[in-house]
A protein has these predicted regions:
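Polytopic transmembrane helical bundles with strong interfacial aromatic enrichment
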Residues: 1-333
């Protein structure tokens, strides 16, 4: 396939690589769920040593050991998948930036594994535990993006509508994704600080809109609630923008509506987490769906940039020859 003006159509020829990338992203999502399960059940220190478990490869699977050891097993699977993905990509992928993405993913999962080990060995220090959670979400985003990059249809869209709102959508989705990531970090601080029920009622806070700020636990909990409100505003703004200016483009409409649906589920799970006294299932699901919200927003962001770039390339192709080179250099810069 000839390279497009934007460079997006020079896709990987390997469907197998794409399928492995999708599998890696899916198993990473499972890893995040299991990690949330470990925290929700208080099992993070059920196995006190690392990388072994009670001095063995396979410990006796009782009580919280099941969750913590299961978390380690899934993590090992993700490391192996990512290693295979990186090696395969280096040999099969033409695009250097995609190869670099695969290598970055492998480096990130190694950092994540080491942070997990340090978290156990140092008995859950807050900073390391939060860094572990933050890296997990970042790695999940990389796997989702990589799965999109290796899709043989990535960027291969023929009908692209270009209007003045395209750059604004790319900017808006980027901000929305960043806000969601920050909100997840605040949630990680709250979880590892043990402040999930510092404000025991919802939607009010101790019966008021604003709670008494008498402890760091209340401060962090209320910050997470305020963050949820900010995320909701940006997500709705993003979806409304897509539906108003890009409703005919299914590559944007579908993830936008998916983002809205997941946001509704996430807010509902957050409420049930409080109402249930942090029951394991809604609390863990809240962590997992939060990751899904982030990944969906990222997918929408990538598509906004890609489709906008393709539209720019299409415009450049229609420009008379004396000007086309200058526009092409501007697009690819």
């Amino acid at each position: 396939m000839p390279a497009s003006t934007s460079g997006y159509a020079d896709v990987s020829p390997s469907l197998g690589l794409h399928r492995l990338a999708v599998l890696t992203a899916a198993v990473t999502f499972v890893l995040i769920f299991v990690g949330g399960l470990v925290t929700s059940t208080g099992s993070a220190l059920a196995v006190p040593d690392w990388p072994l478990a009670f001095g063995h490869l396979i410990p006796k699977l009782v009580d919280g050991v099941r969750f913590e050891y299961g978390h380690r097993v899934v993590a090992a699977v993700v490391v192996i998948l990512t290693l295979v993905l990186a090696i395969w990509t280096c040999f099969a992928e033409r695009r250097k930036w995609v190869r670099n993405t695969a290598l970055a993913a492998f480096a990130l999962i190694i950092v994540q594994a080491v942070l997990g080990g340090i978290t156990v060995l140092l008995q859950l220090p807050l900073a390391i535990a939060v860094a572990h959670a933050a890296t997990a979400q970042a790695f999940f985003c990389v796997t989702v993006a990589f799965a999109m990059f290796t899709n043989p249809r990535f960027g291969a869209h023929r009908s692209i509508s270009r209007n003045d709102e395209s750059p604004r959508l790319a900017t808006l989705t980027t901000i929305t994704t960043a806000v969601i990531y920050v909100q997840i970090l605040i949630g990680a601080v709250m979880r590892h600080l043990g402040a999930g029920l510092a404000i025991p009622d919802f939607p009010l806070s101790y019966g008021h809109l604003v709670p008494p700020f008498d402890s760091i636990f209340v401060d962090v909990n209320f910050a997470h609630r305020c963050g949820a409100l900010i995320v909701t505003v940006f997500a709705i703004w993003t979806v409304a923008h897509v539906m108003r200016f890009h409703s005919q483009e299914s590559q944007l409409r579908r993830p936008a509506l998916g983002l809205l649906a997941l946001l509704i589920v996430q807010v509902t799970l957050g409420a049930f987490t409080i109402w249930s006294g942090r029951a394991v299932l809604p609390t863990t699901a809240h962590v997992a769906v939060g990751a899904a919200v982030l990944a969906t927003s990222l997918a929408l962001t990538i598509r906004a940039y890609v489709l906008g770039g393709l539209a720019s390339a299409a415009e450049a192709a229609r420009v008379p020859a004396p000007f086309s080179g200058a526009i092409e250099r501007k697009i690819t810069a």
